[in-house]
C-alpha cells in the first residue's frame, strides 16, 4: 500500500472524491496486475498479460460512449497479438482497473486506522483465513441450541449494487462510468440466478463482482450491529470493525429511527445475549440459545426489514431453522454439528463409590464425503459411486508432471480438511486420487495398473502419498518429536483464503 500512496500523491481526505481521472492512468492497470498485491486479492484472474496500454484503455472508454460495443480494430490485433485470441481483453482490463481504483479509499482508511498498531495488522491478515471461522464456532456454538441457515439471494438488478456504492464513493463520474460499463458489456439480469452469474459476469470479472456484491451485503448486515448494541448483555462493538463504511454513525442513527418507528413494540424480542452471525460468500448462519419461537420471530422480522429497506428479496423457504444437537450444518466445505459426549466419572467417599454420568457438548466437523465424491466424479477422477477411473491427459505430459498434478490436488484437499474430526472420509478421497493417478499413468503407457507399478515401482508416488504427519514435520521441524499423533486431531491453518474448486462445486 505504500506504493499506492506514492503513486497517487493525493490528499487523503479527498481521494474518494476524484477517482475518475485515475481510470486514465496507465500505472493503475500495472498495479492491478502486480503480483506483489496478490495478498489484497481474494481470487486471481489470469488469462491476459500484465501490461496494459494507456491508449487501449482510452480507446475502450471512447468506444463505450460512442456505442461501438467494444469493437476491436485490426490495428489493435496487429499491435498486440494477444488481442486476437481474447475478445474479452478490453472489458477485463477496465473491470480489473476499476475494481482496484474503488478499493483504494477503503484500503487507505484501514491503514490510517491501524497506523502505529502493527500487531493488529498482523492479526487482521490471520483473520482473512477461512479456517479462522472454525475456532470461533468451536468456542461459541457448543453453548447454542438453534441455528438459522440462510441462503443469501442475489440482487434483483445490478443497479442496486451501483446505488449502494453512492454511500461510499462520492465521485459521480466514476459511478456513471461503472453503470455504463455494466449496461453495455454485462447482462443486467446476470445476477438473478447464481448459474448465470457464474457463467457470464463473475468468472471474467471476479474482483469487481465480489467488491460490488460484498458492499451490498455489508449494507443489510449493519442491522446486526444495531441489534448487538441494543442488547444489555453484550458489549458494544467498536466502529473500527466497519472501517470501510462512510458515515457509520449516521447510518446507525437512521436504523434507530427506523426501529423506533416500525418495530417499537417488538424491539424487546431481540434482547438475546447469545446471538452469533457468520457469513461466507452466499451463505450465512445465525445461531442463538433461544427457543424455536424466538428464532422464527427473528426470521420473519429480519426478512421483512431487509425486503423493505434494502431491496433484498428473501424467500422464507431459503431460511432453514434447525436444532444444532440433531442437525449437521453444511458450511464452507465442512459438515458441522454439536454432539453430546458422554463421560463416566467414578467418585468415592469413604466406603461408598458413585458413578456420575456427564454429558459434554462438543463441536464436531466432518468431511462431506458424498458431495466431495460428486465433485471428483464431475472432474472425471471417479464415477458417481466413487470408483476411481483414469483421467485423459495430454500425451506430451511426463509421468512426473501427472504425479505432481494429482499430488497437488490431494495435498490441497488434505490441507483444507485438516480440521476434520474423523479422518476416514479423507483417507477415502486420498485413495480415489491415488488409484486414479495410477490408472492414468497405466493408460498412458498402455499397460495395467499392476504391471505399471511393478515395472516402475511405487517410489514415483512418494510425493503424492506424503502423509499429513510428514507435512506437519516439515512445517514445524523443531517440534517434530512432539507432533506424533497430532495429525489425528483437528488442525486449522491461517493461510487458506479461498476454497478449492473441487470443494466449492455444486
From Swiss-Prot:
PANTHER family: MATURASE K. GO terms for molecular function: RNA binding. One of its GO terms (cellular component) is chloroplast. Its main location: plastid. Keywords: Chloroplast, mRNA processing, Plastid, RNA-binding, tRNA processing. InterPro entries: Domain_X (IPR024937), Maturase_MatK (IPR002866), Maturase_MatK_N (IPR024942). Belongs to the intron maturase 2 family. MatK subfamily. Usually encoded in the trnK tRNA gene intron. Probably assists in splicing its own and other chloroplast group II introns. This is Maturase K. It comes from Olea europaea. It is found in: Plastid, Chloroplast. One of its GO terms (biological process) is mRNA processing.
